[in-house]
Amino acid sequence: MRKRINLLREFSVPLIAGVVVALLWANLDPAGYHSFIEQPFFGGMSFHFVVNELFMVLFFGIAAVEITQSCLPGGDLNPLRKAVNPLLATLGGVVGPVLVYLGLNAIIGGPELTRGWGIPTATDIALAWLVARLVFGAGHPAVSFLLLLAVADDAIGLAIIAVFYPDPNHPTEPIWLFLTVAGMVVAYILRSLKSRSYWPYVVVGGGLAWTGLFKAHLHPALALVFIIPFLPHPSRETAHLFEADPRDTSTLARFEHDWKIVVDFGLFMFGLANAGVGFSSVGAATWLVLASLVIGKTLGIFAMGYVGRALGFPLPQQVGAKELAMTGLVAGIGLTVALFVAGVAFVEPDIQGSAKMGALLSGGVSIVAIMLGRALNVRRIP
């Protein structure tokens, strides 16, 4: 049974299933679908609120764990010199889509679509990792390279959400951010007292951070991003991204171990709450988001990867021009975070639905990447 569960998680089945159910429901019974996700059902909270503002706290918390571990000595982003090329590629993978989006928006869009520039900046780590292993094989250095830039990419994505996408319906009230700072202080004190349980950090520190962000009209889903780095962890990281170290029983590792499976299966709810858009929603925002993810990511990562090499920071062995281009293409899968940003970037339902459709269609990059990898005879390393 455990093997089957891990297989479902590995292939992102819960997320994909949630997306499919949402699409079918929203197109067959749109009134019923929107009533389900928008009507209050528990303590005045809607299903959409519970998923996007409460469940996603755990999703971004797990992302913060990966970033924290990668930055520790021995981690994939430490020392900085060995991570320079992936970080430059990350920069290209963020700036490239933004430039493509804004450039195309000036041609086929309009001022009302400008706020969507942040949608194509982040990569869906889990789906990109899956597709990369199918294209390159699990042992290919390009897979690790992609994971590094995807994690750094998500860190930038979190910052973009926090800074550039406050609640458009309410002015930001920065005074409440002192509560978020108080949550960080609590987490620091707990660590100083050598508290080994992650519950006080998450409940007290995370609760204060969530309340501060919510009252400030920012995105409370980011609450644990400010708390996770304070969880006790080893002085040195011994495992790579997505690798479990059975010897690591630190508070940080236990939080990830206990909640990652909840997040993986909970993504069914995320897909259900966010992917319900009508097929008629296809519009200018759809093509802006899709083109920015596919073209912007590919060109940006390819260009900056070679800039890094020219500056003396080499690409991994066995990663040449076609492997780097394929890595950029796979990084264009922006499903999860792109859906989230589309939901906060646009208030108008038609534009939001159109942008979300672009994020959903980016999942089709997986098929293109697998076929192109075979056509280009990309060498697979099991």
Swiss-Prot record:
InterPro entries: Na/H_antiporter_dom_sf, NhaA. GO terms for molecular function: sodium:proton antiporter activity. The keyword Transmembrane helix applies. It is a multi-pass membrane protein. Pfam families: Na_H_antiport_1. It catalyses: Na(+)(in) + 2 H(+)(out) = Na(+)(out) + 2 H(+)(in). The keyword Transport applies. It is found in: Cell inner membrane. Disulfide bonds: none annotated. GO terms for biological process: regulation of pH. Keywords: Antiport, Cell inner membrane, Cell membrane, Ion transport, Membrane, Sodium, Sodium transport, Transmembrane, Transmembrane helix, Transport. Its main location: membrane. GO terms for cellular component: plasma membrane. The chain crosses the membrane at residues 11-31, 47-67, 88-108, 116-136, 145-165, 170-190, 261-283, 299-319, 327-347, 353-373. Belongs to the NhaA Na(+)/H(+) (TC 2.A.33) antiporter family. PANTHER family: NA(+)_H(+) ANTIPORTER NHAA, SODIUM ION/PROTON ANTIPORTER NHAA-RELATED. Na(+)/H(+) antiporter that extrudes sodium in exchange for external protons. This is Na(+)/H(+) antiporter NhaA.
